[in-house]
């Protein structure tokens, strides 16, 4: 319709989502709905991941450096600022970091299903119920969404791996690419 929903006086405006968008102005960050109304009041936050499926936003408290999660529908804080880091790892999984431990959580139950040290990476579950866990470009393992290790590269042959799709992943070993299943 050509109506201005959010005026152009802000320091930064993120791309619009189904729920609305993040706005930063005068050093304060908030979330507004598609009508331009604040859902999450401006505060001293850094912006993290946005889960557009579940309407959740990771914000890091600028004073404590701890991360929490807010609902972008209601503005309610659903996970307090207590974690060193939070990333969404799929439609019902998230990865949290606290005290040198990186844990994969089931968002429905609230329970950790897998944990490693923070020098390891837990890749997101994109279009599958499988993902890679690795330490840089080594120590590759495949886990399912329940945290069970299905494969471990004990010989250290894998140099790089792509996300799983339909149970298969592109994998680089000895400088060449191939496809493997879990």
Regions found by a protein language model. Give the residues of each.
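Residue-level detector of conserved, function-critical positions
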Residues: 1-182
